[in-house]
Amino acid sequence: MIKISQGLDIPISGMPSHEVEHTAVRSVGVLAADYPGLKPTMMVNVGDTVRAGDKLFENKKNPGSFITSPGSGSISEINRGEKRKFLSISIDLDDSINPMQFDTTDPIKCLEESGYFTFFKTRPFNRVPIIGSKPTAIFVNACDTNPLAVSPISIIKHEQDNFDKGLNVISNIFDPEVPVFCSYHDKKPSSVSNINFKEFKGKHPAGLVGTQVHFTLPVSLKRQVWTIGYQEVIAIGHLFTTGNIKLDKYVSLGGEGVYEPKILKTSAGANIDQLTAGKIKENSRVIAGSVLNGIHAKDVMSYVGTFDNQISVLPDEANDILFNWAMPGSKLHSQMGAFLSSWIKPKKFIFNTSINGGNRAIVPLPPYEEVMPLNILATQLLKAIVTKDIELGVKLGVLELAPEDLALSSYVCPSKYDYQTILQENLELIFEEMA
């Protein structure tokens, strides 16, 4: 067991129950934001009919890396932003159209053709692996310590056979020289024999795969590992059992803005507006993913992402309060103990979307180190990435990180920096220089 002592569990109200509700939607989508570095070559047009598993686009920077349709129906929208940047694809579902059938005899080819190869991400760089590459190890994350996240075990138990099958497939993709590690918290998720199970306990970010990789097999430019989430393993198990991609997934719905926080079983890539209709309160902000590192789910971005296991909903109260800085803060959470709440110590806080401050220079305060469990000089690293000193950043350990690993640093930052976006920009610069 590996115990993580540094970090922070945010005491946010609205924890979902383990009740599972089946919720149907009329449309699904695919988000470009799920695939860093993506340069798509479109293989469909608006109005085309697609089967679940049909190819939607290929990453021209990684030939053979396909993103496929999460459901059967017709392409209703291909959404673009500024400078025609690709944002998302929307598909109106039609249950009468049968899904694609895949040949599973060649595991690697099956994963590539089905689009499930894109479930893997690399460390360093947090990208889909280059087709034909081989990792030093594969890490399966069956542990989640994000705020409002339900235990993966509560979902795996509904899909145990698929999860076990997925682990077996992944462990046999390469020769035995590529070990497969599976993290868990409290309860072992499977009894598959050829998997190295690692128990992680402690505060968030104990449940992030970056933390698990750091304490198991740290990465470098010469040592690359692949990572994958537990629901993606379940989907792979389903594919190799049935020959079809998995059309549904589980996503928890939690936060103060939800009437009845619970787990929803819905279509993969579900339209979040349709999924949450009648379930959330007025004047709420819907976040696809964690409150720490999710994206605002609105307009053409309102879909459950490929790697999202939760939807978080907070009261959207961004208006400034007069003399808020002088208030005792009995209902505000502070990692630094700056408010009266540090003495009252309520068990849960009602969080909203206000950031309670504005941008200013980085101040070297203890919270950065206190929430960073990795063997990294946090303050120095943050300064390096803000100034885009990539050489210093590499020396300080930036290659071990993905944006989610700096979410707590952004949360405790009195200077209100978005370190996750800044880190991604640095990783892109380093990757391009290497290329």
Briefly describe each language-model feature range.
Residues V50, L56-F57, L264, I272:
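Generic structural signal for buried aliphatic residues
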Residues D34-L38, V50-G53, N62-E77:
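Generic structural motif
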Residues V44-G53, N79-E82, G243:
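Acidic, glycine-anchored pre-beta loop/turn
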Residues P40-T41, N45-D48, G64-I67, Q160, ...:
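Short, surface-exposed secondary-structure edge patches
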Residues M1-M43, E58, S90, F197-F200:
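N-terminal, Lys/Arg-enriched amphipathic/low-complexity engagement segments
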Residues L38-N45, S154-I155, P414:
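A short N-terminal beta->alpha junction/helix N-cap motif
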Residues S65, S72, I78-A435:
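Buried, small/hydrophobic-residue-enriched core segments of structured protein domains
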Residues A52-K60, D95-P99:
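Glycine-/proline-rich flexible loop or hinge segments
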